[in-house]
Regions:
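N-terminal beta-loop-helix "entrance" segment that forms/cooperates
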Residues: 32-58, 224-226
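Buried hydrophobic positions in well-ordered alpha/beta secondary-structure cores of metabolic enzymes
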Residues: 12-15, 68, 129, 171, ...
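Glycine-rich phosphate/diphosphate-binding loop of Rossmann-like nucleotide-binding domains
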Residues: 7-24, 28-30, 148-220, 232
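N-terminal glycine-rich phosphate/adenylate-binding segment common to multiple enzyme folds
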Residues: 50-154, 241-243
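Extreme N-terminal starter segment of soluble prokaryotic enzymes
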Residues: 2-6
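Glycine-rich phosphate-binding loop
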Residues: 61-83, 205, 211-269, 350-354
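Glycine-rich phosphate/nucleotide-binding loop
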Residues: 46-49, 107, 225-328
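Mobile late-domain/C-terminal helix-loop "cap" segments
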Residues: 291-375
Length: 375
């Protein structure tokens, strides 16, 4: 029997609850499709940081490295300075495990209403592929004369051909299994050096994919076109900063951050990829059972796809979508069940759901990611 070893980082706030709910769906998929899941819990997050003063140590990195994938719930705690856990733990793992490609689906599922008029499941199914380790997020820079009227801040942005090529190549391979339309999003009329490097890489990689159409949209224009005409896009490839911003915009279009999943992908398979819902730790509702585990379940579906378990991924995605369509509210006390109960409903639905009811499985993101899974 195929066995996948998952490292589980529940994290902070609602993170442990939504992760536990998502794992119920993963285990149901394993039972249905004949593979096994073994999990190891890791105590990383605010409590561990407050005890040790370290967000991520080398021993934890090496222990995590021995797993096939990492499931992360959420991090963030009012007792910890904002950014410490996000940079120290999440960005730290992305860099340590060469998770150079971030995958953010923007899909409106049947029964979920978008806040944007005219958006429907028929015209909202795109993927944002974001370079995950470079750009302005490398952290380089300095500030001179802080706290004075003469303060000057310099923030460095680094863009390299190898990292950009790896991201663009991944995007072309993915879009080849979908509708074969790739869009580069940048701001090359202003960020002329980095923007031109991105365009050069896209043009070069495109020569190897003659059946894929590709175009370009400025980042500011994308903020107009994506919400008003999401059906125009199939796969959007972009840099770290623009990808971070656009994927949150996309989450709004698809019904909110509470439904948004993500994958931090190591495309070469040299270290585990990491899967996490986009939402935060929501410490104000932690322990109340008001958090919707759908984004965590959908992230777990991405994890199964990344492990090559296409059928399990499709079933978990379809089960989460099916349960979402039945909820009287997408979060809070009016959701129609607490976090664990919604998780159980998703897991129960996995056992007999038909993925074709939410779209063509052959053109789905789950199928595309499973085909790209390192062997």
């Amino acid at each position: 029997m195929r066995t996948h070893h998952l490292a589980v980082i529940g994290g902070d706030g609602i993170g442990p609850d939504v992760t536990a709910a998502a794992l119920a769906g993963v285990r149901a998929a394993a039972d249905r499709y004949g593979f096994a899941i073994e999990t190891t819990e890791f105590d990383l997050g605010a409590e561990a940081y407050l005890r040790s003063g370290v967000a991520l140590d080398e021993a934890s990195i090496e222990a995590l490295r021995r797993h096939d994938a990492v499931l992360l719930g959420a991090v963030g705690d009012p007792r910890v300075t904002p950014g410490v856990l996000e940079r120290g733990l999440i960005v730290g793992l992305r860099v340590a495990f060469a998770q150079s490609v971030n995958v953010r689906p923007v899909r409106l599922y049947p029964g979920v209403e978008s806040p944007v008029a005219g958006v429907s499941p028929d015209n909202c199914d795109l993927v944002i592929i974001r370079e995950n380790t470079e750009g302005l997020y490398t952290g380089g820079g300095s500030i001179s004369h802080p706290g004075t009227p003469n303060a000057v801040a310099i923030q460095n942005s680094i863009t390299t051909v190898p990292a950009t090529t790896e991201t663009v190549e991944f995007a072309f391979r993915l879009v080849s299994a979908r509708r074969k339309r790739l869009t580069l999003c940048h701001k090359k009329n202003i960020l002329v050096h980095a923007g031109q490097l991105w365009q050069d890489v896209v043009d070069e990689v495109a020569t190897r994919y003659p059946d894929v159409e590709h175009d370009y949209v400025h980042a500011d224009a994308m903020c107009l076109h994506l919400p008003l005409d999401p059906g125009r896009f199939d796969v959007v490839v972009t840099d770290n900063l623009f990808g971070d911003i656009l994927s949150d915009l996309g989450a709004t279009v698809q019904g909110g951050l509470g439904l948004a999943a993500s994958a931090n992908n190591n495309p070469r398979g040299t270290a585990p990829s990491m899967y996490e819902p986009v939402h935060g730790s929501a410490p104000d509702i932690a322990g109340k059972g008001w958090a919707n585990p759908a984004a965590a379940a959908l992230s777990a579906a991405l994890c199964l796809a990344g492990l090559g378990e296409r059928d399990g991924a499709l079933a978990l995605e379809a089960a989460a979508a099916s349960v979402l369509a039945e909820l009287p509210a997408l979060a809070g006390p009016g959701m129609g069940g607490d976090t664990a109960e919604i998780g159980r409903r998703i897991a129960d639905r996995v056992t007999d759901v038909d993925p074709a009811k939410i779209g063509d499985p052959e053109r789905s993101l789950m199928t595309g990611l499973a085909r790209l899974a390192p062997r």
